[in-house]
Structure formats: structure tokens, C-alpha cells
Amino acid sequence: MNFPIGLQLYSVREDLEKDFEGTLRKVKALGYDAVEFAGLFGHGAEEVRNLCKEIGLIPLSAHVPFVDMMNDPDGVLKVYADIGCKFVVIPYLTEEYRPGQPKFQEVIDGAKLLGKKAKELGMQLCYHNHDFEFVKLNGEYALDILYKEVPADILETEVDTCWVNVGGEDPSAYLRKYTGRAHIVHLKDFAGEKSEHMYALIGIDDDKKEEESNKFEFRPVGYGKQDFP
């Protein structure tokens, strides 16, 4: 079975900011079938939808900050529905919303609300994990609590293979665990060991990156620690 291979556009965000259309055309030229948005850089839904259609890219999904969606659920979700996205994803949690913090319950409740509204617009809400969800609350991983508390029909997984591994678990096992609930996957490889400044690599941690030989770093799929066939 062939699966469409897409690019998470956060990885080329600086290029998109300079030349949105040109960057999307280059993404297609590189052989990608689909894209996952991480911001629209001032472009409207109709423009983006038409551009993707012209280029031949599937506007498969979008990473949209949790707080942005909660501040205007109907308006924000409609933008991505109008583009033609099939999935809209909670991409990352800032410190106060993470497991072990009081606002983590707001994420669970918010996912129920957003998942229902996304479904009404013909989209599926997903959650993209990092490593910080792999802390146990009452003996159970927070990530599993989220997926247990929010029904599967309104919240699917977007398993990130790198971050599951960094969190101490087997990505393949997690994909099997959520069979039928894992329609989009982040394939990501890495080298080195879990460290304090890992998130500097994704533009979130502003602290200086580590310089030691075993520092954490991303690698092309198949060139790191992950066991990809």
C-alpha cells in the first residue's frame, strides 16, 4: 500500500515567510505529495487552497496552537476547513498546559470541544506528541490519559516517532497500540541523548545549544538511532 508522503512546513518556515508560493513549488518539486501547515504567513484560505490545487499538493493537515484554537474555535477551524485540510493538529503545549500542571485538564476538555467542532467542519482533530507527555500520572502516561479521556472519533494521534523514543518508549509499539487512530505520523530520526536544550532545535528553547559530542540532534530518516526499514 502506498501512503502519501508530506512535509511539515514548520521545517521551512523561514523560506515560507520570504516566498510562500515559491517555497510550496519547491516542496512539490522535491517529490512531496502533501503538506502540513504551520502558519499561513498572512495568506488567505482561498488563496492557499487554490495554490495547492495548482501546484498539485494535498493540503493534508495543519499544526495550530492550542490557545489560538480555543480563543476562536469556529473562526480558526473554518480557515483550515476552507483550505481543504483533512486534519487539524494540536502541535505543542507550553509549560503551563503540560502534564502535571493544573491546566493540563484544560487541554483534555479543550480537545473534546475542538474535536467536535472540527468534525462538524469535516476535519479530524489530532494531537502531536513530544517527550513531555511521557510522565506518569497515577501510574499512567499522560499521553494515554489524553487519548482515554477524549473519544477516538474526535481525537486521533499524530505519533512523532522521534519524541516517543526520546520519551523512553517504542514508536512502533505506540503505533500498533493506536491502530485505527493513527492516520498521520511524523517520521523523524535523531542521534545523541535526551538533553535540557533539545527544543532549541525546533526554535522554541532560546538557550545555547550544547556542544558536547553526544548532543541531541535530528537526522534524516534512517541515519539516526531509529530502526526504520
Model-identified regions with their sequence ranges:
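N-terminal pre-domain/capping segments
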Residues: 1-87, 156
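Glycine-centered flexibility sites
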Residues: 6, 31-34, 84, 115, ...
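Short glycine/serine/threonine-enriched helix-capping/active-site loop
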Residues: 7, 62, 90, 127, ...
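Acidic-and-aromatic substrate-binding clefts and catalytic sites of carbohydrate-active enzymes
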Residues: 13-18, 34-47, 64-72, 95-99, ...
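Short, glycine/charged-enriched secondary-structure capping and boundary segments
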Residues: 20-22, 49-52, 76-77, 102-105, ...
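Active-site acidic/histidine proton-transfer and metal-coordination neighborhood
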Residues: 25, 66-157, 177
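Acidic/histidine-rich catalytic cores of soluble enzymes
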Residues: 118-220
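Catalytic-core region of carbohydrate-active enzymes that cleave or remodel glycosidic bonds
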Residues: 227-229
